[in-house]
Amino acid sequence: MRAEAYRLFGVDVTEIPGLNELAIPIFSEVGRDLAPRFPTADNFASWLGLCPDNDKSGGQVLWAGVRRIHNRAGQMFRMAASSLHHNRSPLGDFLRRMKAKLGPAAGITATAHKIAIIFYTLVTNQIEYDSSRWAARDEHRHKRFEQKLKRQARQLGYELVPLQPI
């Protein structure tokens, strides 16, 4: 499966968490050359139906949400996203965070959008997936969270002390 996906796309898209078995069906829906049909990754995500859409009239938002597009490739990216719930990858962490923040449906759509953007970038630029880029972001997010906890504890009159390893 991995060798066939590499042959079709020119890059190993099965490295993206969640896209293991879905790489070939996605190829059958979107094809090899994404750049001529979709100038940007946002155009690709919009075609998949993974982008929010705001209907405005007179400056007032009448409706906000994801457009109802029945796109099989978009459904496959959603399936890939929903399979990450128990995955211990950065994308799995992102899914759990978004589900807690936005709700299950919107969290899956947000993660599917992120997977689609990564997929588009890998295929059009012919670069390999590098999960180490996520490590710095996660470390930064944890550091900010720790600072926030310390600030809240200080405001309540407490002091946080890190545990010493045994």
State each model region's role.
Residues 1-166:
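A detector of single, family-specific signature residues
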